Amino acid sequence: MFSNLHLPLNPIDKVNQPPVYYLQVQDGLIICSGLCWTTAYILYIRQAYRDKSYGMPLVCLCANIAWEFLFGAAIPESAAQVVSFFPWFVIDIGIVYTTWKFGREQWKHAPLVAQNLGWILLGGIAGMLVMFWAFLKTYDNRYEAGFYLAWTDQIIVSTTSVAQLMSRNNTSGHSWGIWFTRWIGSVFAELIFVWRYWNYPESYPVAATHVTIFLFIVTEVADLTYPFVYASLDKKEKKKLK
């Protein structure tokens, strides 16, 4: 009964008409990635209330909101994108709120930022929306444009999360759960494109470009650096409590 079930076809799959097993593996990876990232976003909000802080760096939060609004609501390419990205957009609004609510304390060393954090968030989101829209209008291949925007956003999330831990010198706003679900979600996302390229290289050349390989490698290096930095800071914090 369920052997032929799969998510609605994306534009490339409509042309290729791949076998059901290909679609189901692809769908499984999409669903796993989506569930992991959804969990990570919820954990960001929970940790914000626990620590009275925020964990997602400002630049990548603004980029996330812009990307998820564009591809989850404004100009989605498929029903699968709406199902995946619009819920993230809704949850991300909660992250924006907790960042605004608790972020001012984190920026008390920079009063100009602390006093204008709401405007900085609004301006950052608006700026990212315009920049992403301009990139999509400039790039002929919308699929590849969306891909590069998504993975540029991803590399920003991964690298700035490590940088934020190091600059704060504490783990406030962060947790092992956030890191693990975010990292595994990214691994599943990478595997989606590996699977697609393995089966249809002529349809997904973007997955094997030098830029893509760079984005994937740097993302993994940053994500695998994070736990070492977090563990070091967590150990110091626990020593202080003794």
Curated annotation (Swiss-Prot):
Terpene cyclase; part of the gene cluster that mediates the biosynthesis of the phthalide-terpenoid hybrid 11'-O-desmethylfendlerol. Within the pathway, mfmH catalyzes the last step and cyclizes the prenyl unit of 5-O-farnesylcyclopolic acid into a drimane-like structure to yield 11'-O-desmethylfendlerol. The biosynthesis of 11'-O-desmethylfendlerol begins with the NR-PKS mfmB that forms 3,5-dimethylorsellinic acid (DMOA), which is then transformed into the phthalide 5,7-dihydroxy-4-(hydroxymethyl)-6-methylphthalide by the cytochrome P450 monooxygenase mfmA and the hydrolase mfmC. The keyword Transferase does not apply. InterPro entries: PaxB-like. Disulfide bonds: none annotated. It is a multi-pass membrane protein. This is Pyr4-family terpene cyclase mfmH. The keyword Membrane applies. The chain crosses the membrane at residues 25-45, 55-75, 80-100, 116-136, 175-195, 211-231. Keywords: Glycoprotein, Lyase, Membrane, Transmembrane, Transmembrane helix. Belongs to the paxB family. Pathway: Secondary metabolite biosynthesis; terpenoid biosynthesis. It is found in: Membrane. Its EC number is 4.2.3.-. PANTHER family: PTHR42038, TERPENE CYCLASE AUSL. Glycans are attached at N170.
